[in-house]
């Protein structure tokens, strides 16, 4: 194993540049499909460090950067999209930096930069020691929406020997838990408009169809397999009450423990939509917006990450960083703080501290209700992930608190630690062929043919 302290020192020497990239992207958040500036920052940076950059046509702002030759292909995935309406200053009070603007409440400014640290550090040490191997950085836009599914379908990840990534969180742990599969789609109902007071009999209400469809989903819930969740909103309910609505729409999310459960559920949902139109003499169409498979962790890589995370020195917070973390933590309700730890089996007594300053190993055998586009990649190649405590304990993703924390100096320290861990793990994979062999053996033993949940 490469000396972890040596790797950490190399990363520390470039800390101003890495922190600057993370802060720059945090200060200039771009939502899914609009990450032109953010992706350009990474492409230009990687090109300047000797990586060859290839942009992918199937998805705007997606790319691959590669450096090195021969040996195994060790890849890292980086994200950089922000969330709409989540603007927040780096402070302990809810205060948008720009009202209604996006913000990095999922910490993707950190995720992309941390994976950049890993790719550059691994490429440096492999070349310095004359070790063969290709290091890749995949730029993955729109994680909060469509995700990297077009890249998976195009086979962009298929020839990688191992892929790793990470995410900001409130604990330091390998990501052993699985995620839920999902599909999101809009059901659009078409009726016939008429005057609701003068000639209601001449109209056919698309809103009636949408409401009957939604009611059918409510009655269906009881008879779905455990773990299947339905969430919906009426995204179009008509324009005025005195017009029989010609158009209406329901925006629906379907979640399931594993991807192969989605098609059967969707067959029943399609029947419900058809039934609603028969009752109202309307018609319907549907538009699939996104879909993600469940994440299937490769435990050979997860075990390696846990081993490495125990050797790379954890960062130390300053007094100011600890004070900031305490102030942010205090803005989260006591019960809400537990919601970040309980799903992955982390002990709740961790909440006595503002920052997780030790190494955990949580989530084995657990599944979270959320969905990750990393899941689709894990169906085609061995994938491992880790979490780093970029946020105070009890602070969850997609909150103003996580957005504030993601712009802090502590978050940048945790980001560099995560990148260092990923680099050291990549070095182990590149130099110990038995690890790659074992990871692939595990992958093949559990392999399920890939089918996107969008392919209904």
For each predicted feature, which ranges?
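Acidic/His- and Gly-rich active-site-bordering loop/insert found
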Residues: 2-104, 109, 113-133
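Non-cysteine beta-strand/loop elements that form the S-adenosyl-L-methionine
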Residues: 75-77, 190, 386-389
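Histidine/acidic-residue-rich, glycine-tolerant segments that coordinate divalent metal ions
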Residues: 63-64, 83-85, 92-103, 109-110, ...
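A short small-residue
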Residues: 2, 20-24, 94-101, 189-197, ...
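Short Gly/Pro-enriched turn/cap motifs at secondary-structure boundaries
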Residues: 54-55, 175-179, 364-368
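Metal-dependent amide/peptide-bond hydrolase catalytic core
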Residues: 211-456
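Divalent metal-coordination and catalytic microenvironments
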Residues: 25, 76, 108, 137, ...
């Amino acid at each position: 194993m490469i000396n972890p302290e040596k790797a950490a020192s190399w990363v520390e020497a470039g800390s101003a540049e890495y922190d600057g990239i993370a802060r720059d992207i945090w200060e200039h958040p771009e939502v899914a499909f609009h990450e032109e500036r953010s992706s350009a920052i990474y492409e230009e940076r990687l090109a300047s460090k000797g990586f060859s950059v290839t942009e992918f046509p199937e998805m705007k702002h997606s790319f691959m950067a590669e450096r090195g030759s021969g040996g195994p292909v060790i890849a890292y995935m980086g994200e950089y999209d922000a969330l709409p309406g989540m603007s927040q200053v780096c402070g302990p009070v809810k205060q948008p930096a720009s009202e209604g603007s996006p913000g990095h409440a999922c910490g993707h400014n950190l995720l992309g930069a941390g994976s950049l640290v890993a790719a550059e550090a691994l490429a440096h040490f492999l070349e310095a020691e004359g070790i063969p191997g290709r290091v890749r950085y995949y730029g993955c836009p729109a994680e909060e929406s469509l995700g990297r599914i077009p890249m998976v379908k195009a086979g962009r990840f298929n020839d990688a020997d191992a892929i790793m990534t990470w995410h900001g969180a409130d604990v330091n742990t390998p990501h052993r838990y699985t995620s839920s599969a999902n599909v999101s789609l809009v059901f659009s109902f078409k009726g016939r408009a008429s005057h609701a007071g003068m000639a209601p009999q001449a109209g056919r209400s698309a809103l009636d169809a949408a409401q009957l469809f939604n009611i059918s989903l409510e009655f269906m819930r009881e008879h779905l397999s455990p773990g299947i969740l339905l969430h919906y909103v009426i995204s179009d309910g008509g324009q005025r009450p005195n017009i029989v609505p010609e158009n209406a729409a329901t925006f629906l999310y379907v979640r399931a423990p594993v991807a192969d459960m989605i098609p059967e559920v969707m067959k029943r949902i399609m029947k419900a939509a058809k039934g609603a139109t028969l009752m109202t003499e309307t018609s319907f169409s549907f538009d699939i917006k996104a879909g993600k498979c469940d994440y299937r962790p490769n435990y050979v890589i997860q075990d390696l990450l846990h081993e490495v995370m125990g050797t790379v020195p954890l960062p130390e917070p300053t007094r100011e960083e600890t004070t900031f973390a305490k102030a942010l933590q205090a803005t989260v309700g006591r019960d809400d703080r537990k919601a970040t730890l309980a799903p992955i089996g982390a002990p709740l007594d961790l909440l006595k501290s503002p920052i997780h300053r030790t190494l955990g190993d949580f989530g084995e055998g657990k599944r979270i209700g959320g969905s990750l586009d990393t899941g689709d990649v894990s169906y085609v190649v061995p994938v491992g992930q880790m979490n780093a405590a970029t946020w105070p304990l009890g602070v969850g993703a997609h909150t103003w608190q996580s957005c504030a924390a993601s712009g802090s100096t502590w978050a940048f320290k945790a980001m560099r630690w995560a990148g260092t861990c990923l680099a050291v793990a990549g070095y182990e994979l590149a130099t110990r062929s038995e690890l790659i062999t074992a990871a692939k053996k595990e992958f093949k033993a559990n392999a399920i043919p890939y089918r996107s949940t969008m392919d209904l």
